[in-house]
Design a protein with these regions (language model features):
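Eukaryote-skewed repeat-based solenoidal scaffolds used as protein-protein interaction platforms
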Residues: 47-50, 56-190
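N-terminal alpha-helical scaffold/docking segments in eukaryotic complex subunits
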Residues: 1-55, 194-262
């Protein structure tokens, strides 16, 4: 059985070499420059197939996708966390995948949301999606998740988020802050480096990283206040674990750049 270029095949109908070949083709197409191949074809198929794969197959897929974090092609790098997020949502995660992701995420310099030729790139948003998925996966240390989100926000950049990347990062942070095992101190400790960075501000144009961070924290304040829903589920809205402390911490941090607040 051979899959069409549109991935109309059902992975459950494949066994042996044809199944392995189909997964090999999927991995290769997930780095394709053509968005019709990468996004509309391979990624949509990956999202459909991943829950149906054997656990060992998901691990092999994750191992191969993680290599994409050092790929010279930006679209390969930026789609890697999106695929890993789907693997995490299917219930699997390997600790070996963390370091490649954590090294890439704050270091990625191409933060364009959409490119006319390459289609969606969305590095900041896709990385946030993986953080959000990990926040709901057992055994994750909340502090390293928040620390990585902060590292991405504070990394120097001239790119102003223009495709709701701030919303996606805020959502990821809200999911992390919703973990029941999160201690009260850790619920706000991650704000300390942001406050320090804000205090380095000088008169003149607001740096892109600062504007991106301000907007992320403002959306997070809304989510912490109103609650959040888990995307792609029918679960009711839930709140962050230490709501009052988080709201107070966010307000105090934002007041550094908005001294006119009450």
């Amino acid at each position: 059985m051979h899959l069409s270029p549109r991935y109309d095949g059902d992975i459950r109908a494949l066994t042996g070499a044809p199944r392995a070949d189909a997964l090999d083709a999927l991995v290769e197409d997930l780095r394709a420059a053509d968005p019709a191949v990468r996004d509309d074809g391979a990624y949509v198929t990956a999202a459909r197939w991943i829950p149906m794969l054997e656990r060992a197959e998901r691990h092999r897929l994750g191992d191969r996708i993680t290599v994409h974090f050092t790929d010279p092609a930006v679209q390969a790098r930026t789609f890697a966390p999106l695929v890993l997020a789907r693997i995490v949502e299917a219930g699997d995660w390997r600790e070996a995948w963390w370091s490649p992701f954590a090294e890439w995420y704050p270091a990625e310099r191409d933060l364009r949301g959409h490119d006319a030729e390459l289609g969606w790139l969305h590095a900041a948003a896709h990385g946030a999606d993986l953080l959000a998925a990990l926040a709901r996966h057992p055994g994750q240390e909340p502090s390293r998740l928040t620390d990585l989100a902060v590292a991405r926000l504070l990394a120097p950049t001239a790119h102003l988020f223009d495709a709701q990347e701030d919303d996606r990062l805020a959502y990821a942070l809200a999911q992390i802050l919703s973990r029941p095992d999160l201690g009260a101190e850790k619920a706000t400790a991650w704000l300390v480096p942001i406050e320090k960075a804000f205090r380095t501000g000088e008169p003149g144009p607001v740096p892109a990283w600062a504007s991106n961070t301000m907007r992320t924290l403002r959306m997070l304040y809304l989510l912490a206040d109103r609650g959040l829903r888990t995307r792609n589920t029918d679960e009711p809205a839930h709140g962050v674990t230490h709501r009052e402390a988080v709201l107070e911490g966010l307000a105090a941090t934002l007041a550094v750049v908005a001294p006119y607040t009450g």
